[in-house]
Amino acid sequence: MPNPNEIVSALVAAGFTHLVWIPDSHLGTWEPALADSPLAPIRVCREGEAVGVAIGLLLGGANPLVALQCTGFFEAGDAVRNAVHDMKLPLKLLIGVRGARAAKAGTGRDNCPHFAQKLVEAWELPHAQFDPAEANADVSAALATLTQVGPRALLWSE
């Protein structure tokens, strides 16, 4: 599994200028590595606010990444819809999918993995899935999927 320093290095290498986020128990482990990076992490209070901040950064010429957990993605739906479909902005989202590994193993009871997948499809967001715990997990390749033209989401298994 990639460590936080490898993840932050891959974010920088992918060309992101800012990480707009609400750290959760998984994504929050990146915080010490972010402190020493050229990324400018911006903590927000709500996930819809994260999308609004990212919109401002995009309009100002920056290349932000919004990182949030799946339940926060659900909360931010209208802001995502507005950014991607009304404003036609190349919004990039890293969505932590709580309970994804347990669901894959058939032991999970959390419905977040089920609805996260359905919601990115409902919003017509091109997306990829990534599980950092897999043996051949390549965080740089996973994050490279977010560098393609247009809006993109990466469903990050937790």
Residue positions per predicted region:
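Thiamine diphosphate
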Residues: 1-158
